Amino acid sequence: MAVNVYSTSVTSDNLSRHDMLAWINESLQLTLTKIEQLCSGAAYCQFMDMLFPGSVALKKVKFQAKLEHEYIQNFKVLQAGFKRMGVDKIIPVDKLVKGKFQDNFEFVQWFKKFFDANYDGKEYDPVAARQGQETVAPNLVAPVMNKPKKPLGTGSAAPQRPIVAQRTPATPKGGTGMVKKAAGDDESAGLIEQINVLKLTVEDLEKERDFYFGKLRNIELICQENEGENDPVLQRIVEILYATDEGFVIPDEGAPQEEQEEY
């Protein structure tokens, strides 16, 4: 039977988003690029097979799942494995299959602790276990996809992203019948590609920022609701929440704003 893990609080033991992806990819020989791609449930099923061989019907897992009902089917397999091994954790399937960062990141943080508590270090061939099936990244639709200038796809698919590298309709001179490619076109295309990748990185960082800000806001509300209890622990939490960097001065709301940068 499995060792149950109940702690879900954010601690220094939690891996960052990038470290978590690296651990998953290395352990299962996958190529995930986003936490949201865990919404298919396939990776969790294979981790359960690694921890407790035979606990899940791995043949029923759709490693190439692309549709929500296929994700749900995978999580049903995972739920059956949890029940078989006595895992008490309730899987928020309805939230996970939506492919949102916050829900999937919270669940994988718990799962990593669960894995560490149960893994005995035995060797495991993930590719052979899934019979060589290649996984397919879920077709996630980000909430900012309506921005006209946002590049499509993920950072890993950058080389296949169509980029118009400032192709100018120059007329051939000297009767050669050929349009010479400007020397700076390759460099421009490379710079545009770097910009696109950086935009995606910024978007991911903003999601992560909003995720942790939401947690801090919830903590603040709890402290405010119990403000009259004079609990020293709550008071200490409030002090930490409102602490500022050394030398930081809160600006006077009535003072005119000066020295703003001009662009």
Swiss-Prot record:
SUPFAM superfamilies: Calponin-homology domain, CH-domain, EB1 dimerisation domain-like. Residues 14-116 form the Calponin-homology (CH) domain. One of its GO terms (biological process) is cell division. Residues 180-250 form the EB1 C-terminal domain. It is found in: Cytoplasm, Cytoskeleton; Cytoplasm, Cytoskeleton, Microtubule organizing center, Centrosome; Golgi apparatus; Cytoplasm, Cytoskeleton, Spindle. Gene3D superfamilies: 1.20.5.1430, Calponin-like domain (1.10.418.10). Its main location: cytoplasm. InterPro entries: CH_dom (IPR001715), CH_dom_sf (IPR036872), EB1_C (IPR004953), EB1_C_sf (IPR036133), MAPRE (IPR027328). This is Microtubule-associated protein RP/EB family member 1. It comes from Coturnix coturnix (Common quail). The gene is MAPRE1.
